[in-house]
Amino acid sequence: MPRIALYPGSFDPVTNGHLDVVSRAVALCDRLIVAIGVHPGKKPLFSTQERLEMVETVFAPVAAAAHCAFDCTTYDNLTVTAAQRVGATIMIRGLRDGTDLDYEMQIAGMNETMAPDVHTVFIPAGVSVRPITATLVRQIAQMGGDVSAFVPPQVAHSLTTKFAG
């Protein structure tokens, strides 16, 4: 039975922190599905389509190099429901610090109650990417700062283009 993992997030934008988690997650599964959460009440910087393209461009080569099947999807319901919908038994969550752990443990507990067959796997972020958040990246880019140390080159280009107009 293939090990299918779901890695959910907003990916607005994709950061080197996300890339770090994906590079570790592909070693744990046969198929990785990155799921972009779409929330009607939120106004993301990048459209759903732009985020799908970013995720595919940045993560697919990493998965291919690890001989891990890769897919990208969107969801607008509970994350655990999205995991069940795609047949995932592993939910990948990246952790930067203790604050992330406290929050993610609560979510993992609730998810376990709703879907005991979906197991949360925490992947600690590498030291070099721990301070990176998509929110900070957006703020730096919006103010004209250089985000190249925090995001893949394709994403840096997309951010520069987005804020140039």
From Swiss-Prot:
Enumerate the residues binding ATP: 10-11, 18, 94-96, 104, 129-135
Q: Where in the cell is it found?
A: Cytoplasm
Top-level taxonomic group: Bacteria
Q: State the UniProt keywords alphabetically.
A: ATP-binding, Coenzyme A biosynthesis, Cytoplasm, Magnesium, Nucleotide-binding, Nucleotidyltransferase, Transferase
One GO BP annotation is: coenzyme A biosynthetic process
Name the cofactor(s) required for activity, per the record.
Mg(2+)
- The EC designation for this entry is 2.7.7.3
Q: Which residues bind substrate?
A: 10, 42, 79, 93
List all membrane-crossing ranges: none
Annotated site location: Transition state stabilizer: 18
Describe the subunit structure. Answer: Homohexamer.
Tell me, what does this protein do in biology?
Reversibly transfers an adenylyl group from ATP to 4'-phosphopantetheine, yielding dephospho-CoA (dPCoA) and pyrophosphate.
Q: Which family does it belong to?
A: Belongs to the bacterial CoaD family.
PANTHER family associated with the record: PHOSPHOPANTETHEINE ADENYLYLTRANSFERASE
Q: What is this protein called?
A: Phosphopantetheine adenylyltransferase
Naturally occurring in which organism (per UniProt): Rhodopseudomonas palustris (strain BisB18)
Classification lineage: Bacteria, Pseudomonadati, Pseudomonadota, Alphaproteobacteria, Hyphomicrobiales
Gene transcribed to yield this protein: coaD
